[in-house]
Curated annotation (Swiss-Prot):
Residues recorded with modification Pyrrolidone carboxylic acid: 1
Domain of life, per lineage: Eukaryota
Function: Inhibits trypsin; probably participates in a plant defense mechanism.
Primary location group: secreted
Disulfide linkage: 4-21, 11-23, 17-29
Localization: Secreted
Keywords: Disulfide bond, Knottin, Protease inhibitor, Pyrrolidone carboxylic acid, Secreted, Serine protease inhibitor
GO MF annotation terms: serine-type endopeptidase inhibitor activity
CDD domains, sorted: PlantTI
Protein name per UniProt: Trypsin inhibitor 3
Native organism taxonomy: Eukaryota, Viridiplantae, Streptophyta, Embryophyta, Tracheophyta
SUPFAM superfamilies in UniProt: Plant inhibitors of proteinases and amylases
Domain notes: The presence of a 'disulfide through disulfide knot' structurally defines this protein as a knottin.
Length: 30
């Protein structure tokens, strides 16, 4: 389990996302 805050955040790359979230193919962190 990754430490990923459950917020809807648009992204283009993993580093755009907080915590251990990754940028998913739908364009949002998850």
């Amino acid at each position: 389990q990754r430490a990923c805050p459950r917020i809807l955040k648009k992204c283009r790359r993993d580093s755009d996302c907080p915590g251990e979230c990754i940028c998913k193919e739908n364009g949002y962190c998850g």
